[in-house]
Amino acid sequence: MQILEKIIETNGLIFAFLFVGLIMLLSFWISKNLLNNKIPGAAIAILIGLSLAFLGDKNGISDIPFFAGIAILGGSMFRDFSIVATAMSADISKIKQAGLAGVISLFVGITIAFFTGALIAIIMGYSDIVSITTIGAGACTYIVGPVTGTALGASSEVIAISVATGLVKTIFTTIITPVIAKKIKLINPADAIVFGGLIGTTSGVVAGLAATNEKLVPYGALTATFYTGLGCLLCPSIFYLVLTLL
């Protein structure tokens, strides 16, 4: 056992990849076999991650020597790399297929989500601009929230709330999309492109459209992918400045 502990502590980052991989494997198994894909595997993995964050001390589970590599894997370097990697999978020329409506939906979706989240933060009792901006960004997606919070120097508690906010949005989108699809006439690729731009949470949009019509998934995912990148640009800069002026 001591030999195993020494090997893991020496190769902390490798073990962190293995540990997160096992969580993802378990999460997607639960999503597929127990929840009938009604909740995305990514959302379940985030819930597990947030739960594990309460273990340890200030730095969460990474304070436990056995899981020290999580601190590196969960740091800003790998986080930003993941975001860039996601954006690289989308061809910028393809967004033109959505026309002006697709572009407008991105800006409208991010703006509505951000200021709705900011209002929720104020109702929750937060008064400082950094916290309000971070939680507002979390209402865009659970990636935009921590990116914005880190950029502005928000507390770990506020960043966790922003992630939780985005997670609720993802689960809600997954469940409600197939229910309201016919009512909002979400029936063709053009509709899916606008829908992805308005909602933005990629995993929620993909899961929701998959339950509605699998042929619509690539189109919704297209604009939803750009949503995260655009949110990471707007929230800690322009939207933050807007809130400071209000």
Positions of PLM-derived features:
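Alpha-helical membrane segments and immediately flanking helix-loop junctions
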Residues: 129-172, 189-226
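Interfacial helix-loop-helix linkers and transmembrane-helix boundary segments
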Residues: 31-39, 61-71, 88-104, 124, ...
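Transmembrane alpha-helices that form the ion-translocation and gating core
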Residues: 104-145, 172-187
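Hydrophobic core segments of alpha-helical transmembrane domains in multi-pass membrane transport
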Residues: 16-29, 45-56, 82-85, 117, ...
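Entry/N-cap segments of selected transmembrane alpha helices
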Residues: 9, 13-20, 73, 92-118, ...
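Hydrophobic transmembrane alpha-helices of secondary-active transporters
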Residues: 49-54, 67-97, 143
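Structural signature of hydrophobic alpha-helical transmembrane segments
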Residues: 7-20, 66-82, 108, 128-137, ...
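Short, strongly hydrophobic alpha-helical membrane anchors
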Residues: 1-10, 246
